[in-house]
Amino acid sequence: EEGLDFPEYDGVDRVVNVNAKNYKNVFKKYEVLALLYHEPPXXDKASQRQFDMEEL
């Protein structure tokens, strides 16, 4: 049965902070790039902890 051939996870996370200076190098280095935008967490510790848990 034919279908889509999805790549398997190889166990290596490739998370990069993309900014105005390094985005061209990131485009050259990786075949696929997904950008996730989010607001920065508030300054209090509870908000920071919630943000960290959601990112995991």
Curated annotation (Swiss-Prot):
Residues with PTM Phosphotyrosine: Y9
PTM section of the record: N-glycosylated.
Presence of the UniProt keyword NADP in the record: no
Gene3D superfamilies the UniProt entry points to: Glutaredoxin
Entry-linked Pfam families: Calsequestrin
Compartment(s): Endoplasmic reticulum; Sarcoplasmic reticulum; Sarcoplasmic reticulum lumen; Sarcoplasmic reticulum membrane
Molecular function terms from GO: calcium ion binding; identical protein binding
Disulfide bonds: none
GO biological process, alphabetically ordered: positive regulation of release of sequestered calcium ion into cytosol; positive regulation of store-operated calcium channel activity; regulation of store-operated calcium entry
Mitochondrion among keywords: yes
Topology term for the membrane: Peripheral membrane protein
Signal peptide: none
Domain of life where this protein originates: Eukaryota
One cellular component (GO) term of this entry: sarcoplasmic reticulum membrane
Positions where Phosphoserine occurs in the chain: S47
Keywords: Calcium, Endoplasmic reticulum, Membrane, Metal-binding, Mitochondrion, Muscle protein, Phosphoprotein, Sarcoplasmic reticulum
Chief place of localization: endoplasmic reticulum
Assembly behavior: Monomer; increases in response to a depletion of intracellular calcium. Homodimer. Homotetramer and homopolymer. Can form linear homooligomers. Ca(2+) ions promote oligomerization. Interacts (via C-terminal end and preferentially with the monomeric form) with STIM1; this interaction increases in response to a depletion of intracellular calcium, decreases both STIM1 aggregation and clustering, interaction of STIM1 with ORAI1 and store-operated Ca(2+) entry (SOCE) activity. Interacts with ASPH and TRDN.
Family: Belongs to the calsequestrin family.
Described function: Calsequestrin is a high-capacity, moderate affinity, calcium-binding protein and thus acts as an internal calcium store in muscle. Calcium ions are bound by clusters of acidic residues at the protein surface, often at the interface between subunits. Can bind around 80 Ca(2+) ions. Regulates the release of lumenal Ca(2+) via the calcium release channel RYR1; this plays an important role in triggering muscle contraction. Negatively regulates store-operated Ca(2+) entry (SOCE) activity.
Protein's UniProt name: Calsequestrin-1
Organism: Canis lupus familiaris
Name of the gene: CASQ1
